[in-house]
Amino acid sequence: TVGSRVNKGSTFRVELAFPLAEDVPPGDAGSFCSGGNVPDESLPLGDLVGQRVLVVEDNELNQYVILNMLARFGVETCVAENGRDAVDRYAEDQDFDVILMDVQMPVMNGYDATRRIRESGLPRCRSVPILAMTAHAMRGDEERSFAAGMNAHLTKPIDVRELVFSLSRWGSAARRNRK
């Protein structure tokens, strides 16, 4: 259906009938990652179990996708809907192994939120891994993430393998340093 109002805008609604996808059993996360050049056996999924990750993402659909992905890997998550919320949540609880930070959000963007966390003086503010999770994939975007104080730059749509290896690398190191 299509609807349009002068000086108000247009709305378009499309309905498509698709069969429901099969659920992936919780213990079968490796098959969820199948495909690509990396064999499933090489994915360090065990490193992710029990990690605490702060997901900073304003888009509800993106939240749903990343939270479900992380849940399949046994990752505990907390959500912040914008950069200001992320700074506030970190001020309340610094016990995160990784922060996955979208960069383009309302209220406060991810670059500014990262700078605020890094400069906060809170425990682990300089060492907690902050990984950009963004659609910004142009030349210079990765450098901008690093300049803001982020440790890595993951582009959307998120590649499951890259996410797993990044969380294994950064989250495992953060856990070792906290103990």
Question: How should these model regions be labeled?
Answer:
Residues 1-179:
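C-terminal compact regulatory domains
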